[in-house]
Amino acid sequence: MDGAKAEVFSVSVDTKMGAFKNSLLLLTLLLAIHLEASKIVYKKPLYGNSNIIKDKRIKTKPVKLETSTMSSTGVASSSTTAEEDWPTAVEFVIMTTPASELEASTETIGNNGTTETTVGEAPIIGSSEGSTRSMEPTTASPLMSTNPSSSSSLVSTIPLPPTAGLPVQDNQPVPCTCGVFLSSQIPNGLPTKPLIHQELDHMFPCNAIGRKQCQTKCLETIVQHLPNSANIVCSALGHDCHKERAYLFIKNCHNQWVNTNLQAGREYCCRSGVPYRCPLMG
């Protein structure tokens, strides 16, 4: 009984071992098939590059000219067109100057102070012709001169720098002086005595900027008295006037009156020191 059980047990073990071996063999076979399939897949070209070698062979393949079916005139025309398609030859010009000419040019530079160079015959190297062409001699313009008269004239045209020791009078501050003149007071140019004269307390530099600042200050002062300007003008005038215009002047650095080209926007009419309305006509 025990022997039969042992025999059955050994048979089952052998069966299991055989099945295990068969499964291992089957697994090995499947792995081999899978690897072979993957090799075949990777041997295929990617992204449509299968025709690269074929395209290269087509590009590098020389094109044969069909001359058997063409006549003699056709052959001549094809040869001329092929020659026309060739790139044009580039000519290189080599300019050479003999040593004797170089020595002569240096001697003329040392003696006369001018540079004169001549260009003789120079060979022109081309693609199909080996002939030479003669170049006409050219003379360069003088670049420098050592003539003492020209150097002295050049020095004389250079302005001298300003001397720093002298004081600059134009930048000295001066008082701002305003003056009002009527049109009858300036018939012949620069007036001498204004109708209204006022010297302000402000000091300005004696230059264009200072004059502009003084002019602005005078305008500010006049605007303050603008509503009563007619009474001020007639009382200061002392006699009758008819359609007079008032102009603003300021004094410059030389104590002279300068017209600012500024005038009142109205006309003044005075009778016995009293202003009245000027008529439109007459």
From Swiss-Prot:
Annotated effect of mutating G74A: In strain: Usa3, Usa16, Zim7, Zim10, Zim13, Zim16, Zim18, Zim22, Zim39, Zim41, Zim42, Z36 and Z50
Sequence segments annotated as region (Disordered): 103-156
Known tissue expression: Expressed in follicle cells during vitelline membrane formation.
Reported impact of S77T: In strain: Usa3, Usa16, Zim7, Zim10, Zim13, Zim16, Zim18, Zim22, Zim39, Zim41, Zim42, Z36 and Z50
Impact after mutating A164T: In strain: Usa8, Usa12, Usa16, Zim7, Zim10, Zim13, Zim15, Zim16, Zim18, Zim22, Zim39, Zim42, Z36 and Z50
Biased composition (Polar residues): 128-140
Consequence when changing P167H: In strain: Usa8 and Usa12
Outcome when changing T108S: In strain: Zim10, Zim13, Zim16, Zim18, Zim39, Z36 and Z50
Result when mutating V168A: In strain: Usa8, Usa12, Usa16, Zim18, Zim39 and Zim41
Segments of skewed composition (Low complexity): 106-118, 141-156
Superkingdom per UniProt: Eukaryota
Protein name: Follicle cell protein 3C-1
Protein species of origin: Drosophila melanogaster (Fruit fly)
Lineage: Eukaryota, Metazoa, Ecdysozoa, Arthropoda, Hexapoda
